[in-house]
Amino acid sequence: MKPPILIIIMFTVISGTIMVLMSSHWLMIWIGFEMNMLAIIPILMKKYNPRAVEAATKYFLTQATASMLLMLGIIMNLLLTGQWAVLSTLNPIVSNTMTVALAMKLGLSPFHFWVPEVTQGIPLLSGMVLLTWQKIAPLSILYQMAPSMNPHLLMTMALMSVLVGGWGGLNQTQLRKILAYSSIAHMGWMIAVMTYSPTLMLLNLSIYITMTLGTFMLFMFNSSTTTLSLSLTWNKLPLITSLILIIMLSLGGLPPLSGFIPKWMIIHELTKNNMIITTMLMTITALLNLYFYMRLTYATALTMFPSTNNMKMKWQFESTKNMTMLPPLIVISTMLLPLTPMMSTLF
């Protein structure tokens, strides 16, 4: 893809998301979603091959269906209230229709089937955009709609997402699929606390995006896409491999890393609102996520694969890739826990 075309496409993707974030008019929000969806497809197919085309087609069909449902909800809301404003969405049927549409866009369970397949079929850079930037616009609309949404529907989808995110990643060897299932689980945690503390959801989103960006950048740095290729990099790039494992444990929510903060605060918020059983179920299923990250860490760091001396010296001759954002992302992804008392005063 030529640089000018790529710049135009990226500008359209960013403009679509910003339009959704800044609008309180349903038609402008829908147009922003469509701009974003149509512009992201060439990015998904940046490396043109059959798997990328299949992934982009699955993504397009899912997002088009979600956009159709969203437009149906917008029209129903217009007929019932005569208004285009987001905050006028008070009818339960309209609210549920829009919630389902946005859940499809986010990849929440039971509409999660496209997320692992699409993420696996596209390059690492495209996967990074899909699992971070593409989550911002739908979550911003859910944030605005939080007072009028059905809490039982949200909690059901949240529980299913956390369960699917943990269960689905157990037997995976592809790193992109593991991150896709981790994304589903994180979305579940965000949706669970949406009706009780929408601001806490934003904290969870920011920490999730930071950790996922750092993980994808490290994967791109050492060109790892499978657990086998990751385990073989221990001899070549020991420091980078160690950082990958620490960030992945943070994604799993292991204390004292940054990924533990949102889970801790969400558990506190849910128990404060007497959601004891739901919190217990979510906490138990979150252990599945932590388990497959710890298993990956054990296989990579504590079991050394046979290697030659030439392989061990190979890292000295590799050209280094310039990733300026990597050090701050790694620090934020691992060392934010001491700031928790200050954060707790804000939510």
Swiss-Prot record:
It is found in: Mitochondrion inner membrane. Its main location: mitochondrion. It catalyses: a ubiquinone + NADH + 5 H(+)(in) = a ubiquinol + NAD(+) + 4 H(+)(out). GO terms for cellular component: mitochondrial inner membrane. Signal peptide: none annotated. It comes from the Eukaryota. InterPro entries: Complex_I_Subunit_2, NADH_DH_su2_C, NADH_UbQ_OxRdtase_chain2, ND/Mrp_TM. Its EC number is 7.1.1.2. One of its GO terms (molecular function) is NADH dehydrogenase (ubiquinone) activity. The keyword Kinase does not apply. GO terms for biological process: mitochondrial electron transport, NADH to ubiquinone; mitochondrial respiratory chain complex I assembly. Keywords: Electron transport, Membrane, Mitochondrion, Mitochondrion inner membrane, NAD, Respiratory chain, Translocase, Transmembrane, Transmembrane helix, Transport, Ubiquinone. It is a multi-pass membrane protein. The chain crosses the membrane at residues 3-23, 25-45, 67-87, 150-170, 178-198, 201-221, 237-257, 274-294, 323-343. Belongs to the complex I subunit 2 family. Core subunit of the mitochondrial membrane respiratory chain NADH dehydrogenase (Complex I) which catalyzes electron transfer from NADH through the respiratory chain, using ubiquinone as an electron acceptor. Essential for the catalytic activity and assembly of complex I. PANTHER family: NADH-UBIQUINONE OXIDOREDUCTASE CHAIN 2 (PTHR46552:SF1). Core subunit of respiratory chain NADH dehydrogenase (Complex I) which is composed of 45 different subunits. Interacts with TMEM242. This is NADH-ubiquinone oxidoreductase chain 2. It comes from Mustela kathiah (Yellow-bellied weasel).
